[in-house]
């Protein structure tokens, strides 16, 4: 359904030189913010005399979060190199609020946030909302088969989903453990989702 929507409504739109630069700087800023956020959490945890269970889970897995952010940062630079000379960007009608609850009888509902923009936004939002509930690898494979993403679109997609969410604050230790474990699950699942595409890209070089 999503691929069909994007296929039927996509076209190339001329953009100014600053368009890609603006996207690059916005994402760079978000990555920098997350890196500082997680570095601060690590330093606080490192200085704890007696590590709480939630802090133990975080400290033990911090390297994976850091690796995900380094990957996003490195790929963002590669993405910017790809689009530097582009004068057009592919856009289409996007739902802009994709989740399973907005799919009813094989139709998309709740169109309040629709807009014309890059198709990548719909895939990112669907993944962020439903990564725990569906086999996204299969969905992404089918989507790309029906609506092949351009190299710079695919790269942008993987950059955006590889950025881990912030850890929600809680005063309950059990809840903290649960939330941190969920962030780690997100990081591991996302790495697993992206890996085959990166491997294929390396083989094609």
What role is predicted for each listed range?
Residues 82, 159-160:
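Short acidic/histidine-centered micro-motifs embedded in hydrophobic/aromatic stretches
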Residues 119-151, 161-182, 186:
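Active-site activation/catalytic loop segments of kinase-like enzymes and analogous catalytic loops
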Residues 18-93:
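ATP-dependent phospho-/nucleotidyl transfer catalytic cores
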Residues 153-155:
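Extended alpha-helical coiled-coil "stalk/arm" regions that scaffold and mediate dimerization/assembly
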Residues 74-123:
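Active-site acidic catalytic loop and adjacent metal/ATP-binding pocket
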Residues 3-6, 49-55, 65, 86, ...:
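Gram-positive cell-envelope targeting signals
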Residues 1-30, 144:
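Conserved kinase catalytic-core helix
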Residues 59-81, 181-205:
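Regulatory N- and C-terminal appendages and interdomain linkers associated
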């Amino acid at each position: 359904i999503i691929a069909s929507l994007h296929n039927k409504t996509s076209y190339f739109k001329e953009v100014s030189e600053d368009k890609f630069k603006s996207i690059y700087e916005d994402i760079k800023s978000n990555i920098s913010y997350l890196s500082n956020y997680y570095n601060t959490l690590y330093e606080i945890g490192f200085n704890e005399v007696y590590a709480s269970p939630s802090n133990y889970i975080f400290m033990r897995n911090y390297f994976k979060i850091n690796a995900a952010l380094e990957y996003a940062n490195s790929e963002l630079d590669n993405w910017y190199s790809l689009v530097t000379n582009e004068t057009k960007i592919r856009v289409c009608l996007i739902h802009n609020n994709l989740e399973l609850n907005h799919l009813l009888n094989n139709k998309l509902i709740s169109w309040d946030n629709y807009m014309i923009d890059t198709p990548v936004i719909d895939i990112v939002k669907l993944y962020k909302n439903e990564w725990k509930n569906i086999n996204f690898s299969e969905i992404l494979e089918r989507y790309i088969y029906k609506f092949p993403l351009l190299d710079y679109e695919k790269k942008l997609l993987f950059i955006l989903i590889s950025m881990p969410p912030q850890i929600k604050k809680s005063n309950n230790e059990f809840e903290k453990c649960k939330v941190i474990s969920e962030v780690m699950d997100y990081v591991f699942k996302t790495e697993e989702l992206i890996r085959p595409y990166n491997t294929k890209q390396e083989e094609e070089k």
